[in-house]
């Protein structure tokens, strides 16, 4: 008897809707999830900066800012954490349930890291809570130690775009 192994297939837009609306009962939760992601990004930068001094050479005042434009119906959450490159965007945002924080913890443990930073994210789905209140989500990011900035955008239709590379200093 011949057997064949197949991969599961999914209707991504419907799966995202199911995940987001099943996990979170209150729309306000999206803000907590996005702030948690920003906090983890800062903690990762601080931790890596202990051994990679060039990552924190600009002596940042770590922080998260939230700006709301009611007339444009937009909210912008800004942090000065570790940032992401194109590969990170694809892996962390373009792959549902892929936790960058979980992968970071695992890599540190494999290197023998004992004093691991207190990071919040674990499951790789909190970011998608933004779709409870937004039709479109855009992430603009630059990984510390690099000059390339990237934009990732999705309307939860199942497709996303990791595009618009731009080289900037700082």
Give short role names for the model-derived ranges.
Residues 1-170:
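GHKL (Bergerat-fold) ATPase N-terminal catalytic module, capturing the glycine-rich phosphate-binding loop
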């Amino acid at each position: 008897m011949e057997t064949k192994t197949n991969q599961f297939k999914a209707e991504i837009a419907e799966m995202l809707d199911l995940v987001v609306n099943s996990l979170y009962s209150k729309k306000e939760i999206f803000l907590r999830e996005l702030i948690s992601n920003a906090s983890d990004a800062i903690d990762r930068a601080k931790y890596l900066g202990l051994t990679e001094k060039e990552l924190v050479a600009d002596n940042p005042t770590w922080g998260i800012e939230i700006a709301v434009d009611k007339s444009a119906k937009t909210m912008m959450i800004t942090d000065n954490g570790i940032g992401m490159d194109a590969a990170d965007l694809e892996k962390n945002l373009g792959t549902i349930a892929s936790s960058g924080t979980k992968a970071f913890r695992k890599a540190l443990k494999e290197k023998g890291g004992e004093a691991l930073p207190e990071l919040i994210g674990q499951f790789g789905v909190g970011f998608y809570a933004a779709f409870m209140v937004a039709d479109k989500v855009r992430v603009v990011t630059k990984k510390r130690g690099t000059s390339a900035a990237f934009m990732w955008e999705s309307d939860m239709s199942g497709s996303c775009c990791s595009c618009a590379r731009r080289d900037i200093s700082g």
